[in-house]
């Protein structure tokens, strides 16, 4: 139905531009809607026919009419199910669509109303039938006739509706045939339109091809234009480069020519000045040399003294730093000890509170027991008279029992001695073989640590504390001495700096005084600044030391307080340990939620204690975190001080450099007119200073680069290590969380097992009680088996038989021998038992320090009646083992002497009555857990120690940084120390990682042990199940025996009644025999008296037995009454169920009878149905023929619809293609216009940009060329000066040599002739000497070689300057070579001067 409704029809085509096209589309849509409605009606007709056939078979239900009407309604209004605005065609307006939709909805409402009326009529008819059937004698024939009539009416109405629907469908078929003819005409029209559209598409495709060709041509033109622009730009760039190179060459030539002119002029001036200033310069240099030697010697002596003092003080400071690091390590160890002690004291305080609460509970229980005891003593006094007769019989039994008790006590004492010996052996084996397996070691550590070892540990701790105090005193004294030395050294340094004379006196005399004064002032200011900075640093460090001392003193006081508290708690614990023996240690059980609902219960108090403990642990953690924060703050402050000092040093260096540059500038300005000697000396000194500075800068830069590389590598290495450690720590935390989860699951399973075991134990104890009661009854019934035989026997034999029966009863269950005497007393002491259970419950809640499984209870005796009252051990033993659990955490710390208090002794003596056997399995488990705690705490302590040891190393490193760096190597020393400290930290972190891995392994081992223990507990649970099954079988047997005993008791009561009758008969016989002779009477009387005595004795015995049996019978009667009540309840339930079953059977009979009547009705209805089916088959044949016609019409319709849809889709596609092509054409035209405009704009913009870039490049080139020219001028001037200096020195050396020669060959006649010749020729004397003097050939060759070398050097420098860019290193090497030559020449010059003198 849904497939044929208009909602599933394909969507209408889009609106065309032409009106003819829209009208055709509208008509097609209308026709499509009419066809879909016709198909919907046809489907409805088919379904009505199917419904009719179904209704004939389902006439009993009365719902076929409703189903058929509902489907017909759905067929009438198929459009109503479609969504709003999606089903009407495009030709209709929205208002018309709304009107049609409202009409359809009204039709649906009317159909629904008709259906509702039919449903109500059916309902009323069904209710009327139900009322008739519920009558006492219903007329089934009338009801059946009514139903048949009702169904006939329904079938007639349905037939009418079917005929109406068929008529409607015939009319619609005719309409559809008319629409088919219309559609065929439209298809012909569409085919014609298709041909027209194809022609239009071909024309448009041709146009598209033409446009694409035009577009390609224009794109090629744009590319060609771009390539032309790029080629022009490249040509412009090449032209600009060539012009720049030519400019540079011309400038270099101009500068060279200018430099040559300046050099020539300078040489002339230089030669003239040198001739006049050589003599004066030599004298000044000699004086300066003498003074410089004296000053250097004095400076060296001072320098040696100061260096020795510095070395001594550095060594002392290093020793102090080492002492401080050791003290810090010791302090951190003391802090760890303090933390452990604080945790231990907190645990002990909790224990003391628990013990006090237990004290109060025990006192209350003891008072209650005293009250009960007084009441019981009164009852015992009343029963004393009754039990006096039974005393003789029970005396023998008591003697035997006492002997057995003594034997058992001896056995227990022997076992305890054996246990003590075994423990001693285990301790010895632990000392000799520490490499035992973990399971054996855990089982062997159940004993407590000896007192001697703890006392030795306390003594060693005291000695360590005294040693640390002495070290602190020594360190304080050294610090005070260092302060005084530093102050003396700073004063001496200031005096020395004030007295230092100036070294440099090689400058001219005019600016010397001002320059020397400025240098002295600068040095004084520098010294004052250094002194102030050092004083500030000293004050800061003294403050830090004072703060550290205060902190150490406070921690020391806390330690002492903790030691006192620890001793007091240890003494109290030792008292408990001495009073009680060895006992098991158990963990506090967490209370369940249902136990916390009571306000004043033990569970609530235990939960409060647990939360208090956790709060204390969190407080301890908070304190540790605060300490770590304080340490980090201290490190931050130290880092800040180091950063400030480094910044200060950098600022000082910068100031020195600026001051030196300023001084050089002032000196240049102050001496514009110098002599030739002063200028040469200054140039030499400048060159020397520049060389030294260059070398120092190079060395420092290399060192700094190397150090920076090393530091970067170390930082990267440390970062990788840190990441690795962080990942490891995260993995370990995850593993720990998983282990904790597993342990929690295991504990949860254990708690569940414990609850199950306790329930089983209670069942076992009840079964054992019943068994012991049955056995006691059996033993007492055996005494009453044959009373006639016992009446003839003497009293001694009766007593022996009673003893033997008691012994047999004892041998039935060997393990319960000690408790059978207390059987009757236990029944009377129910109130005392209750008080015991209260006390044991409180002990259970407060003593479970470890969560232990109760598997060990299987080893306890099976038939003990006191097992419920003595399930838990002595209070003193529990307290001892809780102290043992705490003592391993301390690792055998100090234990002191312990005083015994009377209250605790009394309490322990009172509680020792409730002690039972020691349990081994839980003890081993508790020791395992204690060892785990020990290992975990040791590892955490080692981690803390490692971290704390890393912190002093860091402090030491940063203190070493704070030392004033007076040499250039101080920075390298500090970096090396930092590297060493980082390596130490790395090693410590590696150790911590190994410790964590070991702890994880131990946790895994502990988990495996817990799993093994769980398996053991499961095995024990299975064995307990088996024992329970055995006990149930024993119970069944005992119940049978009980029934037999009851029968015997009844027979014994009959025998007692016969004995009473015999005594009554004997009394009249005695009266009758009194008339006889006296002798026979006396004899008979004596015999009768003896018999009576025997009978009375037996009667008293039997009466006492009967009384006990009566008491037991009363108890059994109570039990039987309870069972009778249960049975009566069960019988009532059974009777109620029987009544229900009878009612159900009666109803079943009634229903069967009604079913028979209904079956008869069904047979009649089936006959009618057969006749109707035959009619329906005939109708079906006619309907099938109509269906075939409809199918043929529908197929043709579907074919035409497909053809129509295909043509529509093709037209839509072509329209879309046309629209897309038109849009593309428009886009291409707009794009072409845009491209042309953009190309023109881009070309203009590129031209402007190229102009701007060229202008900027020209400016940059000009500035760069100017800089390069200035640099080349500077280099050439420097080179010329160097070369002129070399020439000058060589010329001076030659003149000196000539002076030597002239002195040797000096004559008055030659001298006069030379003067005359000079005056005649107008030549100076030196020129004349040059003319006259003929030099040696070797010297001439040397001078030529030197000149050639100088020219080659100049050409090499010019090539470097004109060559490619990386030429700085080569230029520097060439200049350094020339400077070295100048140095050598100056040294030769000075040697020649000395020789001339």
Curated annotation (Swiss-Prot):
This is Centlein. The modification Phosphoserine is found at residues 5, 9, 22, 1219. The modification Phosphothreonine is found at residue 1334. Required for centrosome cohesion and recruitment of CEP68 to centrosomes. It is found in: Cytoplasm, Cytoskeleton, Microtubule organizing center, Centrosome, Centriole. InterPro entries: CNTLN (IPR038810). Keywords: Acetylation, Coiled coil, Cytoplasm, Cytoskeleton, Phosphoprotein.
């Amino acid at each position: 139905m849904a497939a044929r409704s208009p909602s599933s029809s394909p969507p209408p085509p889009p609106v065309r531009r032409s009106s003819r096209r829209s009208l055709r589309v509208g008509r097609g849509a209308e026709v499509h809607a009419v066809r879909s409605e016709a198909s919907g009606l046809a489907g409805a007709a088919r379904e009505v026919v199917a419904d009719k056939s179904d209704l004939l078979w389902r006439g009993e239900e009365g719902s076929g009419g409703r189903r058929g009407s509902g489907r017909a309604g759905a067929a009438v209004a198929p459009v109503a199910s479609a969504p709003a605005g999606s089903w009407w065609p495009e030709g209709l307006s929205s208002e018309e669509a709304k009107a049609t939709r409202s009409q359809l909805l009204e039709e649906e409402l009317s159909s629904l109303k008709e259906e509702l009326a039919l449903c109500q009529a059916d309902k009323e008819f069904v209710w009327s039938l139900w009322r008739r059937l519920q009558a006492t004698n219903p007329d089934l024939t009338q009801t059946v006739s009514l139903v048949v009539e009702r169904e006939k009416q329904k079938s007639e109405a349905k037939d009418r509706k079917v005929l109406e629907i068929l008529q409607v469908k015939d009319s619609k078929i005719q309409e559809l045939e008319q629409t088919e003819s219309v559609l065929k005409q439209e298809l012909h029209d569409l085919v014609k339109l298709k041909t027209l559209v194809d022609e239009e598409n071909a024309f448009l495709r041709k146009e598209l091809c033409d446009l694409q060709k035009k577009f390609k041509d224009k794109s090629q033109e744009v590319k060609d234009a771009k390539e032309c622009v790029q080629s022009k730009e490249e040509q412009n760039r090449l032209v600009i480069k060539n012009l720049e190179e030519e400019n540079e060459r011309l400038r270099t030539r101009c500068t060279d020519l200018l430099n040559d002119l300046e050099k020539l002029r300078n040489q002339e001036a230089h030669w003239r000045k040198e001739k006049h200033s050589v003599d004066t310069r030599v004298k000044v240099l000699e004086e300066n040399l003498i003074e410089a030697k004296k000053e250097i010697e004095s400076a060296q002596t001072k320098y040696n003294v100061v260096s020795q003092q510095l070395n001594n003080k550095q060594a002392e400071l290093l020793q102090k730093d080492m002492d401080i690091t050791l003290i810090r390590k010791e302090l951190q160890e003391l802090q760890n000890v303090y933390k452990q002690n604080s945790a231990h004291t907190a645990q002990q305080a909790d224990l003391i509170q628990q013990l006090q609460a237990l004290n109060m509970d025990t006192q209350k229980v003891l008072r209650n027991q005293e009250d009960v005891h007084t009441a019981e003593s009164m009852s015992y006094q009343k029963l004393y008279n009754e039990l006096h007769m039974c005393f003789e019989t029970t005396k023998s039994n008591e003697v035997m029992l006492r002997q057995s008790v003594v034997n058992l006590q001896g056995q227990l004492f022997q076992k305890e001695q054996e246990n003590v010996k075994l423990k001693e052996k285990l301790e010895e084996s632990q000392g000799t073989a520490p490499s035992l397996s973990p399971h054996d070691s855990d089982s062997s550590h159940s004993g407590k640590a000896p007192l001697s070892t703890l006392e030795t540990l306390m003594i060693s701790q005291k000695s360590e504390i005294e040693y640390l105090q002495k070290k602190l005193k020594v360190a304080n004294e050294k610090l005070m001495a260092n302060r005084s030395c530093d102050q003396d050294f700073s004063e001496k340094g200031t005096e020395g700096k004030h007295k230092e004379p100036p070294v440099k006196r090689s400058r001219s005399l005019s600016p010397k005084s001002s320059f020397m004064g400025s240098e002295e002032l600068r040095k004084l200011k520098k010294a004052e600044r250094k002194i102030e900075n050092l004083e500030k640093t000293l004050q800061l460090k003294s403050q830090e030391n004072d703060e550290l001392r205060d902190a150490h003193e406070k921690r020391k006081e806390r330690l002492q307080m903790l030691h006192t508290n620890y001793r007091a708690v240890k003494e109290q614990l030792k008292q408990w340990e001495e009073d009680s023996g060895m006992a098991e240690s158990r963990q506090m059980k967490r209370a369940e939620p249902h136990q916390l609902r009571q306000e004043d219960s033990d569970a609530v108090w235990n939960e409060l204690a647990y939360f208090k403990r956790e709060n204390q642990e969190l407080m301890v953690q908070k304190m540790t975190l605060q300490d770590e924060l304080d340490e980090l703050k201290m490190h931050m402050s130290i880092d800040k001080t180091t950063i400030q000092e480094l910044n200060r040093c950098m600022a000082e260096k910068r100031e020195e450099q600026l001051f030196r540059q300023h001084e050089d500038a002032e000196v240049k300005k102050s001496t514009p007119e110098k002599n030739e000697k002063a200028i040469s000396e200054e140039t030499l000194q400048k060159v020397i200073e520049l060389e030294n500075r260059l070398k120092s800068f190079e060395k420092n830069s290399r060192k700094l680069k190397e150090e920076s590389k090393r530091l970067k590598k170390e930082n990267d290495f440390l970062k990788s290590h840190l990441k690795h450690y962080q990942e490891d720590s995260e993995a370990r935390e995850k593993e720990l969380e998983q282990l904790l989860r597993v342990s929690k699951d295991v504990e949860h399973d254990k708690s569940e097992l414990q609850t199950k075991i306790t329930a089983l134990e209670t069942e076992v104890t009840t079964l054992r009680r019943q068994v012991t009661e049955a056995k006691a009854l059996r033993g007492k019934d055996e005494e009453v088996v044959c009373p006639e035989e016992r009446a003839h026997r003497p009293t001694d034999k009766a007593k022996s038989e009673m003893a033997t029966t008691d012994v047999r009863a004892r041998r039935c269950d060997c393990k319960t021998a000690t408790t059978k005497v207390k059987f009757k007393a236990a029944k009377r002491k129910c109130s005392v038992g209750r008080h015991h259970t209260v006390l044991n419950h409180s002990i259970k809640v407060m003593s479970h320090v470890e969560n232990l499984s109760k598997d060990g209870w299987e080893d306890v005796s099976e038939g003990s009646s006191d097992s419920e009252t003595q399930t838990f051990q002595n209070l003193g033993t529990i307290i001892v083992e809780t102290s043992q659990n705490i003592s391993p955490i301390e690792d055998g710390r100090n234990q002191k002497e312990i005083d015994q208090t009377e209250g605790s002794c009394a309490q322990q003596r009172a509680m020792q009555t409730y002690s039972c056997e020691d349990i081994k399995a839980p003890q081993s488990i508790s020791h395992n857990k204690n060892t785990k705690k020990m290992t975990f705490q040791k590892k955490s302590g080692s981690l803390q120690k490692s971290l704390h040891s890393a912190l002093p190393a860091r402090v030491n490193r940063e203190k070493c940084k704070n030392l004033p760096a007076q040499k250039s190597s101080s920075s390298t020393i500090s970096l090396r120390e930092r590297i060493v400290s980082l390596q130490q930290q790395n090693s410590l972190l590696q150790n911590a990682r190994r410790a964590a891995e070991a702890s994880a392994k131990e946790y895994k081992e502990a988990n495996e042990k817990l799993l093994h223990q769980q398996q053991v507990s499961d095995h024990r649970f299975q064995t307990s199940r088996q024992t329970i099954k055995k006990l149930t079988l024993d119970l069944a047997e005992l119940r049978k025996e009980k029934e037999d005993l009851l029968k015997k008791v009844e027979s014994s009561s009959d025998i007692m009644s016969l004995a009473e009758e015999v005594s009554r008969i004997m009394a009249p016989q005695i009266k009758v025999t009194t008339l006889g002779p006296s002798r026979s009477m006396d004899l008979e009387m004596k015999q009768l008296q003896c018999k009576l005595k025997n009978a009375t004795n037996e009667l008293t015995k039997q009466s006492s037995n009967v009384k006990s049996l009566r008491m037991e019978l009363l108890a059994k009667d109570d039990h039987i009454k309870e069972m009778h009540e249960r049975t009566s309840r069960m019988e009532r339930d059974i009777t109620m169920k029987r009544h229900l079953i009878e009612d159900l059977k009666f109803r079943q009979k009634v229903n069967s009878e009604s079913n028979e009547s209904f079956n008869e009705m069904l047979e009649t209805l089936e006959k009618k149905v057969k006749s109707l089916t035959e009619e329906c088959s005939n109708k079906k044949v006619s309907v099938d023929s109509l269906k075939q016609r409809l199918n043929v019409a529908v197929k043709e319709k579907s074919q035409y619809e497909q053809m129509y849809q295909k043509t529509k889709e093709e037209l839509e596609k072509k329209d879309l293609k046309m629209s897309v092509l038109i849009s593309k054409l428009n886009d291409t035209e707009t794009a072409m216009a845009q491209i042309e405009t953009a190309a023109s704009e881009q070309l203009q913009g590129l031209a402007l940009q190229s102009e701007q870039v060229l202008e900027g490049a020209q400016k940059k080139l000009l500035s760069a060329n100017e800089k390069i020219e200035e640099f080349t001028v500077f280099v050439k001037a420097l080179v010329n000066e160097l070369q002129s200096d070399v020439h000058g020195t060589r010329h001076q050396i030659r003149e000196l040599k000539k002076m030597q020669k002239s002195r040797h060959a000096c004559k008055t006649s030659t001298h006069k002739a030379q003067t005359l010749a000079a005056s005649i020729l107008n030549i100076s004397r030196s020129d004349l000497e040059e003319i006259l003097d003929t030099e040696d050939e070797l010297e001439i060759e040397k001078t030529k070689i030197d000149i050639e070398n100088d020219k080659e050097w100049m050409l090499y420098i010019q090539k470097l300057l004109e060559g490619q860019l990386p030429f700085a290193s080569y230029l520097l090497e060439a200049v350094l070579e020339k400077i070295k030559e100048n140095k050598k020449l100056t040294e030769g010059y000075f040697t020649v001067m000395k020789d001339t003198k």
